[in-house]
Amino acid sequence: TELTLKKLTQSLITGVGLLALFGCAPSGQQSAEPAPTLSLERIYTDKEFNSERAPYFRWLDDGSGYTVLEARSKNTQQTDDDSHGVTGNDIVFYQPDGSGRKVLITVEQLTPEGADDALSIENYQWSEDGKWALIFTNGQKVWRHRTRGDYWVLNLESDSLYQLGGETPKETSLMFAKFSPDSQKVAYVQDNNIYVETLGSKNVTALTTDGSDTIINGNFDWVYEEEFSITDGFRWSPNSKAIAYWQLDQSGVEYFTMINNTDSLYP
């Protein structure tokens, strides 16, 4: 019994000694760095926890694949001081199984003559015959959506790129441009009138001329967009010989004055 107590005492002394030894270890080895605090700034300002979205893509009509926008630098030249070049997006084709990739439209093709930068693509579409691409850029909000801007067409056979709107296009003024089914023309709305432009020639024909603040041709006012999600107000006929469109006559709608009492603390 006495021998057992002696061994127990020695064990306790050894244990206390080890605890003291570890207790004297440097503080850096004692514990890991504290976990960062979850804050509103990290969630909403830094967007640290936002998930990545799938890139904007568009299926081809025949279902053979889809196209996406991919960022690339064009004509980059290295100098002693800096790197100079034009950035933009290629339009790239992918097969559904991922086995094939092909650049359909390059940054170079999307750079207007004399411009330093390529067009910033907000939307695009192909003509039915596959020979033209229609590019929407420089969009601005009309009500909720960016439906007014500039439209450019690219001839994929000749690489000719030009802005729609006739010989002297009015900047940021076109809406809802779309190819005719026969791929010969583009129709669009400008200043509440509908126009048709022949591809290549830039010849423009006005289909309506009575557009005004109260007569709206080919598009809709705020109520239709807000309540019914309707914005685009015209369609080509299948044979490309006619256009059906909506016309709104708001001449009987009176103005109603509203007081903005929320833009300052005191009236």
Regions found by a protein language model. Give the residues of each.
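Bacterial N-terminal signal peptides that target proteins for export
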Residues: 2-13
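Beta-propeller folds
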Residues: 11-15, 24-267
